Amino acid sequence: NFNAILGKTDPGRMGFDAVHYNLHKTFSQPHGGGGPGSGPIGVKAHLAKYLPAPLADREEASDGGATGDGYRYFWRNPENTIGKVQQWHGNSGAVVRAWAFYRRYGRELERMSEHAVLNANYLRHRIMQGAEGVHAMPLDGAPAKVVKHEFTLSMSPLKEVVGVTAKDIAKRLLDYGYMSPTLYFPMIVPECLMIEPTETESKEVLDKFAEDFLKILGEDPELVTTAPHTTDVRRVDEVLAARSLVLKHPFDEE
């Protein structure tokens, strides 16, 4: 996940030979709602000959090439390829979109990362300042002076005092019009919420989120544990949904 380090460093300088890149968020792809996500693999030159086949390549064409840009495009197999793997082409639409996004913003992507880090640190400190009427303040999931583009909070103190869990907080945030943060990840943080404001949000939005978040921490526990209350679909039985796999999707012709 590159959202904090664009323009600052790269995997090669860090000593990696092969890296899986997440294209969601940092490179324009949606994260929630099932995607479409994509995770292309990048390798150093000495590993290129082992890459799965086929690879797209091009060569100069004296006749102008099929596309009229002076090149002829073709498939090729690396010298010591491991062969074709499942879904070798990846999510091609997501890759092209990410490439276009990267080319469009260029060096401005470095500023994007700077804003993402600034927003995450500001929101973290804004929440941890607390407010009157809060039943119990969360714990910092990873105590550090500075975080990168995201931070974690443990809602264990709130659970111990009034029985409200991280999941309850996430569901209640839906009533306030927010998309729920990542739940219970990483698992080393008990009752974990991972909050990632990204670079797009203004200070006013971050202040409002912090205000609403702290307000929820002081609400009637029963109101929070039975949330959401304003969404079309209320709290679902997740255990039943996991064990009874029935997919229902409305189609236009219906």
Where are these regions (language model features)?
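PLP-dependent aminotransferase class I/II
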Residues: Q86-R97
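Conserved PLP-enzyme active-site core in the AAT-like
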Residues: N1-E59, G65-G70, N80, V164, ...
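Non-catalytic terminal extensions of PLP-dependent enzymes
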Residues: T9-G12, E59-T67, Y71-V85, F101-E254
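Active-site nucleophile and cofactor-binding loops and adjacent substrate-binding regions
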Residues: H31, G90, Y184
